[in-house]
Amino acid sequence: MNISAKDLTVIPECLIVLIDKPNRGKTASMRNFACKLLARRGVSFVHPRSYPANLKKTGKDFTLVVEISGVRVGIVSAGDGDDCILHAVKVFAKYECRIGVMVVSEPARSGGSKLALDAYLKMKNGCKARVIEISKASIKKDTHEESNAEVTSILLNTLDFELKHTK
Protein backbone atom coordinates (compact mmCIF):
# COMPACT_ATOMS: atom_id res chain seq x y z
CA MET A 1 0.00 0.00 0.00
CA ASN A 2 1.37 3.38 -0.95
CA ILE A 3 0.17 6.86 -0.14
CA SER A 4 1.15 9.05 -3.04
CA ALA A 5 1.83 12.78 -3.11
CA LYS A 6 -1.49 13.11 -4.97
CA ASP A 7 -3.33 11.55 -2.01
CA LEU A 8 -1.73 14.12 0.31
CA THR A 9 -2.88 17.17 -1.67
CA VAL A 10 -6.32 17.12 -0.08
CA ILE A 11 -5.42 16.27 3.52
CA PRO A 12 -7.56 18.17 6.05
CA GLU A 13 -6.18 21.18 7.88
CA CYS A 14 -6.21 19.15 11.08
CA LEU A 15 -5.94 15.42 11.76
CA ILE A 16 -6.96 14.08 15.15
CA VAL A 17 -5.52 10.57 15.48
CA LEU A 18 -6.37 7.96 18.11
CA ILE A 19 -3.46 5.55 18.48
CA ASP A 20 -3.17 2.24 20.35
CA LYS A 21 -2.34 -1.41 19.81
CA PRO A 22 -4.83 -3.74 18.07
CA ASN A 23 -7.93 -4.92 19.96
CA ARG A 24 -7.72 -2.23 22.64
CA GLY A 25 -11.08 -0.50 22.07
CA LYS A 26 -10.13 2.25 19.63
CA THR A 27 -13.22 1.66 17.50
CA ALA A 28 -15.49 1.53 20.58
CA SER A 29 -14.06 4.87 21.74
CA MET A 30 -14.50 6.34 18.26
CA ARG A 31 -18.09 5.04 18.12
CA ASN A 32 -18.87 6.67 21.50
CA PHE A 33 -17.32 9.90 20.23
CA ALA A 34 -19.38 9.81 17.01
CA CYS A 35 -22.63 9.12 18.88
CA LYS A 36 -22.00 12.01 21.32
CA LEU A 37 -21.15 14.28 18.41
CA LEU A 38 -24.34 13.34 16.55
CA ALA A 39 -26.42 14.13 19.64
CA ARG A 40 -25.36 17.77 19.46
CA ARG A 41 -27.40 20.51 17.82
CA GLY A 42 -26.17 21.91 14.54
CA VAL A 43 -24.58 18.70 13.27
CA SER A 44 -25.74 17.69 9.79
CA PHE A 45 -24.92 14.61 7.76
CA VAL A 46 -22.76 14.74 4.67
CA HIS A 47 -22.32 10.97 4.41
CA PRO A 48 -25.79 9.80 5.54
CA ARG A 49 -25.45 6.04 5.13
CA SER A 50 -23.08 5.96 8.08
CA TYR A 51 -25.71 6.35 10.76
CA PRO A 52 -27.57 4.78 12.36
CA ALA A 53 -26.86 1.47 10.61
CA ASN A 54 -23.10 1.25 11.14
CA LEU A 55 -22.87 2.90 14.55
CA LYS A 56 -25.35 0.54 16.21
CA LYS A 57 -23.19 -2.50 15.56
CA THR A 58 -20.42 -2.93 18.08
CA GLY A 59 -16.99 -3.96 16.90
CA LYS A 60 -17.62 -2.80 13.34
CA ASP A 61 -15.52 -0.20 11.61
CA PHE A 62 -17.32 2.80 10.21
CA THR A 63 -17.08 6.03 8.27
CA LEU A 64 -19.00 9.15 9.19
CA VAL A 65 -18.86 12.62 7.63
CA VAL A 66 -20.73 15.52 9.23
CA GLU A 67 -20.84 19.27 8.88
CA ILE A 68 -20.59 21.47 11.95
CA SER A 69 -20.91 25.25 11.54
CA GLY A 70 -19.85 24.97 7.91
CA VAL A 71 -16.81 22.78 8.62
CA ARG A 72 -16.79 19.22 7.30
CA VAL A 73 -15.50 16.63 9.74
CA GLY A 74 -14.64 13.10 8.66
CA ILE A 75 -14.50 10.30 11.22
CA VAL A 76 -12.97 7.01 10.07
CA SER A 77 -12.31 3.81 11.95
CA ALA A 78 -11.10 1.41 9.30
CA GLY A 79 -9.45 -1.32 11.35
CA ASP A 80 -5.87 -2.42 11.80
CA GLY A 81 -5.16 -3.54 8.24
CA ASP A 82 -2.66 -2.20 5.76
CA ASP A 83 -5.22 -0.17 3.83
CA CYS A 84 -6.86 1.59 6.82
CA ILE A 85 -4.82 4.79 6.47
CA LEU A 86 -5.36 5.05 2.73
CA HIS A 87 -9.11 4.54 3.24
CA ALA A 88 -9.21 7.43 5.73
CA VAL A 89 -7.20 9.71 3.43
CA LYS A 90 -9.54 8.94 0.52
CA VAL A 91 -12.67 9.60 2.61
CA PHE A 92 -11.28 12.95 3.77
CA ALA A 93 -10.46 13.88 0.17
CA LYS A 94 -13.76 12.70 -1.33
CA TYR A 95 -15.87 14.71 1.13
CA GLU A 96 -13.44 17.66 1.35
CA CYS A 97 -13.12 17.38 5.13
CA ARG A 98 -11.33 20.24 6.86
CA ILE A 99 -10.90 18.14 10.02
CA GLY A 100 -10.22 14.41 9.96
CA VAL A 101 -10.55 12.08 12.95
CA MET A 102 -9.05 8.63 12.48
CA VAL A 103 -7.74 5.51 14.19
CA VAL A 104 -4.18 4.26 13.73
CA SER A 105 -3.07 0.92 15.13
CA GLU A 106 0.43 0.55 16.51
CA PRO A 107 2.05 -2.70 15.46
CA ALA A 108 2.14 -5.38 18.12
CA ARG A 109 3.69 -8.82 18.23
CA SER A 110 0.26 -10.41 18.20
CA GLY A 111 -1.01 -8.43 15.24
CA GLY A 112 -1.18 -4.90 14.01
CA SER A 113 0.27 -3.63 10.83
CA LYS A 114 3.74 -2.17 10.55
CA LEU A 115 2.85 -1.21 6.96
CA ALA A 116 -0.16 0.79 8.15
CA LEU A 117 1.90 2.59 10.80
CA ASP A 118 4.65 3.31 8.27
CA ALA A 119 2.03 4.69 5.86
CA TYR A 120 0.64 6.89 8.62
CA LEU A 121 4.09 8.25 9.49
CA LYS A 122 4.74 8.95 5.82
CA MET A 123 1.41 10.74 5.57
CA LYS A 124 2.05 12.69 8.78
CA ASN A 125 5.48 13.82 7.59
CA GLY A 126 4.29 14.57 4.06
CA CYS A 127 1.23 16.68 4.79
CA LYS A 128 0.85 20.23 6.02
CA ALA A 129 -1.97 19.45 8.44
CA ARG A 130 -1.77 19.91 12.18
CA VAL A 131 -1.60 16.38 13.54
CA ILE A 132 -2.87 15.79 17.07
CA GLU A 133 -2.11 12.31 18.36
CA ILE A 134 -4.07 10.89 21.28
CA SER A 135 -2.59 7.74 22.77
CA LYS A 136 -5.35 5.57 24.20
CA ALA A 137 -2.71 3.52 26.03
CA SER A 138 -1.71 6.56 28.10
CA ILE A 139 -5.19 6.87 29.62
CA LYS A 140 -5.23 4.71 32.72
CA LYS A 141 -8.67 4.01 34.15
CA ASP A 142 -10.06 1.19 36.29
CA THR A 143 -12.43 -0.14 33.64
CA HIS A 144 -12.66 -0.32 29.88
CA GLU A 145 -15.84 1.81 30.01
CA GLU A 146 -14.11 4.55 32.03
CA SER A 147 -11.22 4.55 29.58
CA ASN A 148 -13.59 4.88 26.61
CA ALA A 149 -15.48 7.70 28.34
CA GLU A 150 -12.22 9.58 28.97
CA VAL A 151 -11.10 9.13 25.35
CA THR A 152 -14.52 10.31 24.13
CA SER A 153 -14.24 13.43 26.29
CA ILE A 154 -10.73 14.17 25.02
CA LEU A 155 -11.82 13.70 21.39
CA LEU A 156 -14.83 16.00 21.84
CA ASN A 157 -12.76 18.71 23.56
CA THR A 158 -10.04 18.50 20.92
CA LEU A 159 -12.61 18.72 18.12
CA ASP A 160 -14.31 21.71 19.77
CA PHE A 161 -10.97 23.51 20.01
CA GLU A 162 -10.12 22.76 16.38
CA LEU A 163 -13.57 23.85 15.15
CA LYS A 164 -12.98 27.26 16.75
CA HIS A 165 -9.68 27.59 14.87
CA THR A 166 -10.74 26.13 11.50
CA LYS A 167 -12.77 28.63 9.52
PLM feature spans:
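Pre-Walker A adenine-sensing motif
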Residues: 1-12
